[in-house]
């Protein structure tokens, strides 16, 4: 018997992410923008891989995002704006985008575009 469709999709996503992680790493000057998506929420972190620390983070679980009216895509846009603001406050203008193996579309693209519009360089 084969795997379920959801298990196959998850394994494929993890393989894509592993391939991507071989090629990119975050530095103090240019941290990695990591996106994690669930069915309900989206989380994003700026990670310095040299010392394994999180520089800044934003999530749709936060109160000001959670209270937003609209769909999950609108919340992703707000999370992208928040991470760009927090990156600027930490003195970061450029990042390496790690989409976590997710396809670039929908909520992932909305978050990335909002971060770019608010001054974050990819």
UniProtKB/Swiss-Prot annotation:
InterPro entries: Ribosomal_uL18_bac-type, Ribosomal_uL18_bac/euk. This is one of the proteins that bind and probably mediate the attachment of the 5S RNA into the large ribosomal subunit, where it forms part of the central protuberance. HAMAP family: Ribosomal_uL18_B. Part of the 50S ribosomal subunit; part of the 5S rRNA/L5/L18/L25 subcomplex. Contacts the 5S and 23S rRNAs. PANTHER family: 39S RIBOSOMAL PROTEIN L18, MITOCHONDRIAL, LARGE RIBOSOMAL SUBUNIT PROTEIN UL18M. NCBIfam families: L18_bact. This is Large ribosomal subunit protein uL18. It comes from Mycobacterium avium (strain 104). The gene is rplR.
